[in-house]
């Protein structure tokens, strides 16, 4: 566990989402050594009530002069270490809406020993006090922001500790190899020979496990943040019409004037539990119109960040040089679907106006945004790309921070290939192995500086 010094201040924050007219109950959470004392000072509880742990008390929070009541409340006392943070925790459950909640919080913060909690600070304390592992705390935050059931399921797995145990076991295997090697460096003559090939094979096996986690992380990120699908193509091919149809909304303006769309527009649907955001963009062409030019430059920026690009062309008039030129300009590392639109206007000869190499592509779908013909094929393609078949069996998903560290670990382990091929002495193996072990330690939080930890938790929401 980490060995940071225990925190002194008592912290307080609103723990529930509050807005006027919404939520009949809200909770304020106080954690730290003066949590109970402070609470006793601001509430009147009738009769003799017991402030012992895991009990609920009934009472009223008073104004500062103790003459008037701010609200009628329930108070939940959890004495450390038997609490979420491991410190003394008091929750005050008051009426919802913003005014009572804020007045009570202000009343609490007026005590010099209490200050407002930073975002994520309750969870950070839970980690520092050994109540939660880092990846568990991160998973709690992911559960809070989950937008689909699958995302919630993955977050629960993380809360149960599956990321922590998986990474720890990989890290342990690396430590075993490092220990063997270091023993050879220190006491070569007393120990049986260590076979380089044997060590290399174990590292290959570890890399395979890590790689699986890295692949899963990509699918996990679709589940969590959804899939961004950018629609592009020449002006007037029907990008906006297609987005409107897929999202069953008349969100984008559609006219027969080329260059209608300028601002980037987004519309979300949920496909088999995965949020899919369609992004409608300005049609690509050379133009002197200043506004359209800005729109086109935004289109290009959007395309780089898409998970999938749909290139639309007008199937009824055929594949043109402009379509070809757009195709060539698309970022090559992003999956592409080509959609021939306006099939309702075509006759039997339309396919002759489209080159064979385009027609033969398996990522080609012919549709009509007007009649809806072919829409099912398009949806099926998207499902194949991101639907439940892709996320079936997915039970562990690293977040972005964890993924970066897993990738850095991979890089360090890959360096060892060179060390092996060049038959370098054992000292060289230890450099990259130690680096890999450190990365995984940063991932699990076992090897982490205080400032890195601050940085991770600052991204949590307030009161978490
Ligand atoms: N009202 C409320 N609901 C909540 C939370 C909270 O802080 N307050 N949680 C916050 O995220 C989650 C639950 N997490 C919690 C984790 C541990 C303890 C706790 O008191 N643990 C003690 C007692 C367990 C026992 O009696 O066996 C312990 O572990 O020792 C409480 C809540 C979700 N619901
Ligand atoms: N017949 C037919 N017309 C369509 C179809 N899809 C779009 N249109 C028409 O084509 C014209 C252009 O449609 P938009 O959706 O505005 O095309 P766009 O690609 O968004 O155009 P820009 O935003 O200007 O780049 C409109 O008149 C639409 O009604 C289709 O499948 N069949
Ligand atoms: K148009
Ligand atoms: Mg448009």
Curated annotation (Swiss-Prot):
- This one is known as tRNA modification GTPase MnmE
Checking Gene3D superfamilies in the record gives: P-loop containing nucleotide triphosphate hydrolases (3.40.50.300), Probable tRNA modification gtpase trme, domain 1 (3.30.1360.120), tRNA modification GTPase MnmE domain 2 (1.20.120.430)
* Record: residues binding K(+): 236, 255, 257, 260
> Per its record, what are the GO molecular function terms?
GTP binding; GTPase activity; metal ion binding
Can you tell me which residues bind (6S)-5-formyl-5,6,7,8-tetrahydrofolate? 29, 91, 131, 464
* Cellular component, GO annotation: cytosol
Lineage, please? Bacteria, Bacillati, Cyanobacteriota, Cyanophyceae, Synechococcales
What's one GO BP annotation on this UniProt entry?
tRNA wobble uridine modification
User: Which keywords has UniProt assigned to this entry?
Assistant: Cytoplasm, GTP-binding, Hydrolase, Magnesium, Metal-binding, Nucleotide-binding, Potassium, tRNA processing
Top EC group: hydrolase
Cofactor (UniProt): K(+)
Q: Which organism is it from?
A: Prochlorococcus marinus (strain NATL2A)
UniProt superkingdom: Bacteria
Q: What coarse category fits the chief subcellular location reported for this protein?
A: cytoplasm
Oligomeric form and interacting partners: Homodimer. Heterotetramer of two MnmE and two MnmG subunits.
The free-text note explaining how the cofactor binds reads:
Binds 1 potassium ion per subunit.
**Domain called TrmE-type G: residue spans:** 226-387
Output the NCBIfam families linked to this UniProt entry: mnmE_trmE_thdF, PRK05291.1-3, small_GTP
């Amino acid at each position: 566990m980490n060995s940071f010094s225990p925190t002194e201040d008592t912290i307080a924050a609103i723990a529930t989402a509050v807005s006027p007219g919404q939520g009949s109950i809200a909770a304020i959470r106080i954690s730290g050594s003066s949590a109970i004392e402070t609470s006793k000072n601001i509430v009147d509880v009738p009769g003799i009530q017991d402030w012992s742990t895991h009990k609920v008390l009934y009472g009223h929070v008073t104004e500062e002069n103790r003459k008037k009541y701010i609200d009628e409340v329930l108070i939940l006392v959890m004495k450390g270490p038997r609490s979420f943070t491991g410190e003394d925790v008091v929750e005050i459950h008051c009426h919802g809406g913003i005014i009572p909640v804020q007045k009570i919080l202000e009343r609490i913060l007026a005590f010099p020993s209490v200050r407002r909690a930073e975002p994520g600070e309750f969870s950070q304390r839970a980690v520092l006090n050994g109540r939660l592992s880092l990846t568990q705390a991160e998973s709690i935050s992911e559960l809070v922001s989950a937008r689909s059931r699958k995302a919630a399921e993955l977050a629960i797995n993380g809360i149960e500790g599956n990321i922590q145990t998986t990474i720890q076991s990989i890290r342990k295997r690396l430590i075993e190899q490092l220990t063997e090697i270091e023993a050879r460096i220190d006491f070569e003559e007393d120990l049986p020979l260590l076979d380089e090939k044997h060590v290399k094979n174990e590292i290959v096996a570890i890399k395979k496990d890590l790689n699986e986690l890295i692949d899963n992380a990509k699918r996990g990120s679709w589940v969590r943040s959804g899939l961004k699908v950018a629609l592009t193509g020449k002006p007037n091919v029907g990008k906006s019409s297609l987005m409107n149809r897929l999202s069953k909304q008349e969100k984008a303006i559609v006219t027969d004037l080329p260059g209608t769309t300028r601002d980037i527009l987004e519309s979300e649907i949920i496909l088999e539990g995965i949020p899919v955001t369609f992004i409608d963009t300005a049609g690509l062409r050379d133009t002197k119109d200043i506004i359209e030019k800005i729109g086109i430059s935004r289109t290009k920026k959007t395309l780089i960040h898409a998970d999938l690009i749909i290139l639309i062309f007008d199937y009824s008039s055929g594949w043109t040089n402009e379509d070809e030129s757009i195709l060539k300009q698309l970022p090559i590392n992003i999956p592409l679907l080509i959609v021939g639109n306006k099939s309702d206007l075509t006759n039997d000869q339309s396919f002759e106006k489209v080159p064979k190499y385009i027609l033969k592509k398996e990522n080609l779908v012919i549709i009509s945004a007007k009649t809806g013909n072919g829409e099912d094929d398009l949806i099926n393609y998207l499902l194949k790309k991101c639907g439940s078949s892709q996320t079936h069996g997915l039970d562990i998903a690293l977040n972005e921070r964890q993924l970066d560290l897993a990738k850095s670990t991979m890089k360090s382990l890959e360096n060892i290939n060179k060390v092996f091929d060049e038959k370098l002495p054992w000292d060289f193996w230890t450099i990259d192995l130690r680096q890999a072990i450190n990365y995984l330690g940063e991932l699990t939080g076992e090897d982490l500086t205080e400032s890195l930890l601050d940085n991770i938790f600052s991204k949590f929401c307030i009161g978490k």
